[in-house]
Amino acid sequence: MALLQIAEPGQSSAPHEHKLAAGIDLGTTNSLVASVRSGDAKTLTDDQGRSILPSVVNYAQDTALVGYEAKAKAEQEPENTIISVKRLIGRSLKDIQARYPSLPYQFKESDNGLPILQTAQGDKNPIEVSADILKSLGKRAEETLGGELAGVVITVPAYFDDAQRAGTKDAAKLAGLHVLRLLNEPTAAAIAYGLDSGQEGVIAVYDLGGGTFDISILRLSKGVFEVLATGGDSALGGDDFDHLLADYLMEQAGLEAPLSAEKNRALLNIATATKIAFSEQDCVDVDVFGWKGAVTREQFEELIRPLVKKTLMSCRRALKDADVDAEDVLEAVMVGGSTRTLLVREMVGEFFGRTPLTSINPDEVVAIGAGIQADILAGNKPDSEMLLLDVIPLSLGIETMGGLVEKIIPRNTTIPVARAQEFTTFKDGQTAMSVHTVQGEREMVDDCRSLARFSLKGIPPMVAGAAHIRVTYQVDADGLLSVTAMEKSTGVQAEIQVKPSYGLSDDEVANMLRDSMTYAKEDMQARALAEQRVEADRVIEGLIAAMQADGDELLSDQEKQDLVKVIEALIELRNGEDADAIEQGIKDTDKASQDFASRRMDKSIRAALSGQSVNDI
């Protein structure tokens, strides 16, 4: 009897081979897919040997074309040929029309305000268009690798917001792809260069694509990538170079706006071809609808110089945020096809004081980094020494008096990371402190998830507020959290380890984030009330302790009775629900006890100076 070999989904048909995974660079202008094969990460090509797939989809009545075939239809069918859909994903129609008023597409608005593109094949939204691009890349990967993909890593610009990231994941789901992770494009480039060149030190990743610009300042050390700062512009890229040159050519040719959609697309194609030619030529001859002329690289560079300067302003801000000087940067990594523009390389080189690094194809570096990470996330490198970059999905905080949450590490912080904060004691003579670690976005402990508790003992007895306890939260690249509490004067410390993400599904994380937004106003009101109650308790306890210590000596019976009434009034307010009333009660109590506090101060000064001469002071 013949035996049929059935491969497990996500595995190749040959036994003992790794799971199949791919990294996808879903770009504004072009997209690529890469995978690790025989230990090397390489981009995967189509049947004509091309690694790049133009991010273009053409919708005919019965068929959808993707890539080069679709791009060829752009001039004849601009309304049915969707280009740079990445700019549209996650945005409302109103936002799109304000940002890109000259798009040739026929839009209509959906019930929830999202854009619908009207094509010959019917209505399409940006997620569906993106899905068609992803489907084409997924098919290429499966045909090349010879099996079903276990999952993919898709790269996104660092500045993509939640809606844009969610739209990208939805597009992948629609394309039938399992998303292992969304990865920031500059981070993907750092992964590729970190493995290939083994750099250590501060690296700047300058990523100028077709539609977006990102700058990331990274520290690379022993296989660990630490993100120091990011910046950029989600609406600036090589497409803008094309538009500026197209406007210039239109002016030189004496054409009047607006052009028809077909002519507009043709003009952009001429501008793009001219821009590419400037990488090798100083002067390019052009033919714009019968007008023949020449454009020099110097003229082109003067047009785009303000945009390149704008990117360098973002670089300057990112360096400032990272507390790093430009001369401290070891390498400037160039990513994105638009970095082939000579002026970009020259100005970036001048800014950082060194020749930019371009040893990996700038079009492919992001996809290669994504492919490397996909291979690891699929479980193909269990012993890999590379520490994966990730972000903390929910904030990590500590419980303070009154059941409040003080956030130590905010959500979306890249790991590995360490943050510290100082706290103090609440009561006189306090010798121990309970450290309660929580996870979540809400303001009150009861609304967050408890992770761990431990106690720091051996704090020297002091007056309230005198002790200094430094609490450090450290999350390593595996998501393992270490919490350390140390009393600074004695060095006594305690610590605990916990895995923050354990037991939380994506849905639970999403629900916690949703609740933090839904109850934001109520949470802030509850926090304000709790803070005032804590302050009231401090004032009440302090005043009672002072009266017990010095009341009989410094206060008359009537004064003691008056202060007792003030304390009772504050206690009543403290037990109420009005934060403003408690705040006013605290002010009234401080005012009523001011004279008593002055007498105690005088007494302390007299005691300190007792028996001393003027020469001793």
Curated annotation (Swiss-Prot):
Keywords: ATP-binding, Chaperone, Nucleotide-binding
Molecular function GO labels: ATP binding; ATP hydrolysis activity; ATP-dependent protein folding chaperone; unfolded protein binding
InterPro entries: ATPase_NBD, Heat_shock_70_CS, HscA_NBD, HSP70_C_sf, HSP70_peptide-bd_sf, Hsp_70_fam, ISC_FeS_clus_asmbl_HscA
Transmembrane segments annotated in the record for this chain: none
Disulfide bonds: none
GO biological process, any: iron-sulfur cluster assembly
Function summary: Chaperone involved in the maturation of iron-sulfur cluster-containing proteins. Has a low intrinsic ATPase activity which is markedly stimulated by HscB.
Family: Belongs to the heat shock protein 70 family.
Protein name as catalogued: Chaperone protein HscA homolog
